Amino acid sequence: SFIERRGLYEARGEGEKAVDAKQGGGGDAARNDEPFFAARRDELQGRVGPRRFRHSLGVSDTAGELAHVYGVDEGEARLAGLLHDWDKGLDDPGILARADELGLELSDELRSMPRVLHGITAARALGRDFPELSPALLQAIERHTLGAPDMSDLDMVLYIADALEPGREGKRVEKLRRQIGK
C-alpha cells in the first residue's frame, strides 16, 4: 500500500506489534470509569478549541453506537473516541516537538506531514500519562488517521466514527451511515 511503501508506519517502536483485540485489551478501570471519562473530557476541553471538542464528543458517541452494533466494547470505544484528537490542538512545530519529546523515530516522509502525527503522539502521550488505558485503545487512537493493514475491530470502529460523527455532512457520509449494521 501507499502507506507501507512510504514507511509511514515506522513510528512504531522496534518490537512493537499490533494489538489483536476485538473488545479491547484490558483497561477495564479506565473504560468503565465515568469519573475518569469526565476528567479526561474536561481536560480535553482545555486542550482543543470548541469545534474540535464538539467533534470529539460526537466521535465518542458515534464510536459507542458502532461498538454496540458490531460487538466491540462500548466503553472502550467511547473513551477512544473522546481521546482520539488529544494532540490535534498542537500546531505543526508543536506536534514535531511532541514527537521528539516522546522519542518517536519518524521517517522523513512522515515528518514532512505533521498534521497526520496527532494520533501517534496522542497515543504515546496518553499511554505514558494514563497507564490504565489499554493497549487496544491506544492502538486505535494511533491508527485513526492513517489506518493500518491489520486493524482490529476497535481500530475500525474509531476510524469510521471519526468519519461519520454527527458534525460531518454530505451525501457520501449519509450513504455510509445507511450502511451501518448491514
Regions found by a protein language model. Name each.
Residues 1-39:
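Non-catalytic terminal extensions that flank enzyme cores
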